Amino acid sequence: MVRQHSQARFLTVAEVADLLRVSNMTVYRLIKAGELPAARIGKSFRVREDDIDAYLEERFTQAG
């Protein structure tokens, strides 16, 4: 099944930080390092909710 762009949920850096229980700066570092994909819209970043899920899944796999 192909997911349409209109269904994707995008979060701000602050929302991602709150979800991951880290600082905004940590989220910016993850984006800059290429560990967390993000789209730049104007001067701010947006992160797809699916990309956060994939990031967490990868981290749990590495830890286990």
Model-identified regions with their sequence ranges:
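Major-groove DNA-recognition helix of helix-turn-helix-type DNA-binding domains
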Residues: 20-44
